[in-house]
Structures are given as C-alpha cells and as structure tokens.
Amino acid sequence: MKRYLAFFVFTIQLHAAEPPACDWVFSGGGASHDKTRAVTTDGAGNVFLASECVGDAMFGDQQHKSAGEMDMCLTKLDAAGMPLWVSGFGGSKTDRAYGVITDAAGNAYVTGHFESTDVMVNGEKLPNAGNFDAFTAKFAPDGKLLWVRVKGGEGSDYGHGIAIDSKGHVVITGAIGGQFFCTKYDAEGREIWHRSPSGKVSGSGHGIAMDGKDHIYLGGSASGAGAFGKIAIESKTSAALVLKLTPEGEGEWVNLIPGTTSAIYHEIACDSQGRVWGAGMFKGSVNVAGQTFQCSGKDYDGLIVHLDVEGQVQWARHLHGPGTDYCLGVTTDDHGTSFVCGDFNQDTVLAGHALTTRGSGDIFLAAFDVKGGLTWVQQAGGKQNDNAYPITFRAPDELIIAGALSTPATFGSHEVTISASSDLYAAKWKLKAVK
C-alpha cells in the first residue's frame, strides 16, 4: 500500500475471519525469468504491474519487444485482469521497475533503477552516471511515456518505493551512495526537495507510504551513526527502519529495530491516522515488543511490526522455519486490519500457525486484526518456486498480490498451467463480508 485511499463511512465493509476467494490470476512473460515488483490500482479498478522482463515477452495479446538484457515493464490490466497495454524502456544491460503508483487522472508513476547506458526515451539517451542509477518515470493512461527523471552518481544507486500525496506530488525512496534518501517531484517531474541523512549512516529505503495529512513514512534499513535533520539515527548493526517525515521532508520520529546480524523492512503501509505496519526479514535475532525472535539457522526469518502514530511498537509477529522466510508486502484497509504476503521454502510457522510447503517456494497471504491476532492465512503456488512481492488493498473488499511463478501453480480455484521458466503474475482476491 503506497498511499491512503479515502472512502466514506457508509462504504465500510467488515470482513469475515476466513480466507478470501481468488477472483482471477493473470500471468505473462517470455522465455526467461520475469517478475512483478510492485502493484497498484487506479480509480476505475485497473491494475498496474511494475515489472522486469528478460527478452521478448507476451502479456495476453500485448507484446513487449526487448531492448536488450532486462527491461523495466509497466503493464495495465482492466478490473477483470485482462491486459490493456504494456509499456516500458531498457537497454543492453539490467533495468528494473520497483515501485508504481497512480494519480487521480489515471497517470502512472514508476520508480526503479537502470544500468544500461544506451536507454532511449522519446528520442533522447537517458543519462547514466555509472553502474545503476535511480529513475522516476511518468506514463499517461494510454501507456505513453511522458518523462523520466534520474538520480545517482558513479556507484550503484537504486529507486525502490514511490507514493503520491493529495496535491499530486510524487515521492520516491531508495539508496544513493549507500544511504537511504527521499525525493519529492511535482506532476511535471520538477524536483521540489531531496533529503538524505548526515553523518555515517548507511542503508536503503525500500517502502514508502502517506497518511491522510501527506506525512511521509520511509521503510528500509539503516546502520551507523548520524541524523536525518534533527532526528538522531544510530545502530551498530543493520536495523529495520521507519522514519516519519513532514510534507516538507523534515524528520519527525524514527523507529529502529536492530538485528544481531541484520534486519530490514521490505515494505511498509500506513493508514489515514498515521499508524504504520512494516513487513520484512532479519538474520540472527531481534528484540521487539518484549519478545526475542531468533532465526533457527543462517537464513532469513520474516518479521511483521505494527507502530502507533508516535512510532511506538504495538505488536510484532514472526515467520519462523528452518528455511528462508520472507515477509515482503503489506497493506491495510484503514480500519486496523493489515494484510501481509511473502514466501517460504520449507515448512514454517507464521504467528503460531503452521504452513506446509507444496514445493521449493510457496506463497502466503495473511490477515492480522488491530491487536495482531492472525485472522486467516491463504497459500498459493505449486511444486516449483513461487514468490509474492507486493500487495495492495482496494476498497471495499479486494486484495491484489503479484510476483513470479513457475507452472503449474494454483491460486484458490484457479490454476496457471502455461509459462516459461518463470513468469510474472498478479492475482486478485475477494474478501468475504461478515454475514
């Protein structure tokens, strides 16, 4: 969830404490590995997938012609999951889309990073300062690429998360020079401000969200000692980071959860009030909410944390097994329920609930109530490796997850049987109302 979606009290729908039903599944790609990194919707219920594609790819009857090695792709689906168009850009090297959001007019904004030095955008070469540079791009409702803005230096710089405020300004986060950052642009791509920490703070921004008053929340990781404006940041090891900013980019508070080895939020969400949920992973152990979560081996365990409006931890939950466990996407319905997605590659336990693997990597989708109680869990996938990266909620009763799959893969009553080695997908789930 990248922004607060406002809707009136009379549209509120209470959801039953049982798993949702899968409404549809869309998949597409080419002969190699393709995946969706981010998903969002517009006011009409159309679905936008920010993805990476290796080689030529087909999305229903829509074709993407590869520009080189890996291209960033933006695919628009209608509310029934049928592809309307595919757009994007790329060059001879690796170029990825990592975040997507829409405005009230149906324009889509994408952030990510590109390595290619031969990317052409509207007849002009996109400048690259070295290795990977971060980009922000605007696409019209018909898929036309309107503009691209670039940030970065000689090292590897990344764009990861994007959100939009009530004025139509977009904000992005990622990493430049090994530090997290936040940049705000207006709708025409003019930079309004850019912020990053001072001192010896390293880390990366991964998720970004807005509350109902246009406050900005960054999620990711940080280590070292320094400050973000007047807000001190200090952690001896890599810590899961949530940082609240004013609409002008000034720091208000920070919450850090250090891992004995490392910890990071892959995505965050907030509601209109400014309550925050983070989904990520850690190695070693973390102390949070009066508990110690310990990994059973050297692989990652999943972490889910809920903060109040002051940045204080309210509850935390653990995805814990002998294999690799990831909590990757999180969203909220603005009424205290949070939804989390991710994947695991061996039998695992989510907040006390056992999950059994069907293959080498399985998808989970789960709901938590306002106090952190596990309401339901839904699994998806097949006998091979399947992943769920992003999740978004569309009022009153829709959840959409996305990622990569290998066939055959099952999502509720739907089965995907045709794909290449790994295709991107999106799956819409309908929440059940309380009877």
PLM feature segments, named:
Residues 16-435:
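A sequence-level/structural motif corresponding to short, flexible coil/turn segments enriched
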Residues 4-13:
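Sec-dependent N-terminal signal peptides
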